């Protein structure tokens, strides 16, 4: 055997694949509520835990993209913001595609354990709401409607409400290029200028498109999600007491960046 060959475990024995990824803890985190165990409850739990892991990653990436844009042109990190937004888009496409896996569960199979989920609800996903706040859709009223969240989770939401959003960072970036951006009219004018001179304002245009893509993919997820819910439970109320699919449909018109959408009508 070559002296350069080292078998796994012969060096760095303190760290293994399983210990690095905390696999014992991770793989013990799926606890079924159904009794007797419903076959598809494991699938349901796994998918939602994976969503929460991706939400954590998205918060990490979107926060970093925001911070890079807050530094403006002089900060020299706008390329990094572009790169991170591209990663965000890829992850968000995975989130939409993941619904295909959940739809392999039939309504009958879901009903085998659905009643055991109440009053838990996807509405209580703190990270999902953090992501909306960070993206620009801040709504303090959500904190009043949240039930069952911990003080630490409420503190995280309060922090997101007080910190700059991705849109705030985009406006700061516009100002760093000499644009006025204190009113919707000024921002729209800046966007038109960037759109008509993409050579000079290539980074501005690229970041505006990156934000728009983020917005569009969030809309795609909402649309795909509500159709899945209607396929699964029809018009029934949600397990947390919401109106179910009718509430989800009321969220479909949400836009993080209406000025970017409106720009299309002005070109």
UniProtKB/Swiss-Prot annotation:
Instruction: Give the enzyme's main class according to its UniProt record, as a single word.
Output: oxidoreductase
Q: Which reaction does it catalyse?
A: L-tryptophan + O2 = N-formyl-L-kynurenine
The protein's GO terms of the molecular function aspect are: heme binding; metal ion binding; tryptophan 2,3-dioxygenase activity
Q: How is the cofactor bound?
A: Binds 1 heme group per subunit.
Similarity section: Belongs to the tryptophan 2,3-dioxygenase family.
The cofactors required by this protein are: heme
Enzyme Commission numbers on file? 1.13.11.11
Instruction: Give the protein name, as stated in the record.
Output: Tryptophan 2,3-dioxygenase
- This protein's superkingdom? Bacteria
- Name of encoding gene: kynA
Annotated organism of origin: Nocardioides sp. (strain ATCC BAA-499 / JS614)
Q: Tell me which UniProt keywords the record has, alphabetically.
A: Dioxygenase, Heme, Iron, Metal-binding, Oxidoreductase, Tryptophan catabolism
InterPro entries per the UniProt record, alphabetical: Trp/Indoleamine_2_3_dOase-like, Trp_2_3_dOase
Question: What job does this protein perform?
Answer: Heme-dependent dioxygenase that catalyzes the oxidative cleavage of the L-tryptophan (L-Trp) pyrrole ring and converts L-tryptophan to N-formyl-L-kynurenine. Catalyzes the oxidative cleavage of the indole moiety.
Q: Where does heme bind?
A: 225
UniProt binding sites for substrate: 44-48, 114, 239
Q: Name one GO biological process term.
A: L-tryptophan catabolic process to acetyl-CoA
Chain ranges passing through the membrane: none
Q: In which pathway does it act?
A: Amino-acid degradation; L-tryptophan degradation via kynurenine pathway; L-kynurenine from L-tryptophan: step 1/2
What does the subunit section of this Swiss-Prot or TrEMBL entry state? Homotetramer.
């Amino acid at each position: 055997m070559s002296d350069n060959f080292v078998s796994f475990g012969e060096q760095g024995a303190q760290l293994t694949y399983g210990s690095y990824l905390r696999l014992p803890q991770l793989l013990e985190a799926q606890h079924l509520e159904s009794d007797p165990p419903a076959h598809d409850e494991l699938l349901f739990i796994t998918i939602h835990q994976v969503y929460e892991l991706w939400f954590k990653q998205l918060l990490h990436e979107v926060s970093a993209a925001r911070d890079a844009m807050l530094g403006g042109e002089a900060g020299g990190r706008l390329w990094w913001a572009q790169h991170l937004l591209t990663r965000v888009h890829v992850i968000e496409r995975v989130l939409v595609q993941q619904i295909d896996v959940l739809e392999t569960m039939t309504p009958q199979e879901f009903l085998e354990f659905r009643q055991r989920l109440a009053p838990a609800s996807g509405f209580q996903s703190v990270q999902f709401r953090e992501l909306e706040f960070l993206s620009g859709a801040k709504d303090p009223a959500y904190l009043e409607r949240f039930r069952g969240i911990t003080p630490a989770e409420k503190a995280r939401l309060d922090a997101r409400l007080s910190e700059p959003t991705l849109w705030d960072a985009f406006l700061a970036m516009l100002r760093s290029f000499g644009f006025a951006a204190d009113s919707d009219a000024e921002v729209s004018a800046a966007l038109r200028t960037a759109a008509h001179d993409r050579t000079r304002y290539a980074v501005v245009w690229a970041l505006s498109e990156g934000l728009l893509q983020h917005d569009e993919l969030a809309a795609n997820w909402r649309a795909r999600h509500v159709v899945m819910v209607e396929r699964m439970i029809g018009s029934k109320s949600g397990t947390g007491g919401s109106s179910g699919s009718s509430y989800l449909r009321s969220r479909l018109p949400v836009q993080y960046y209406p000025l970017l959408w409106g720009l299309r009508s002005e070109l």
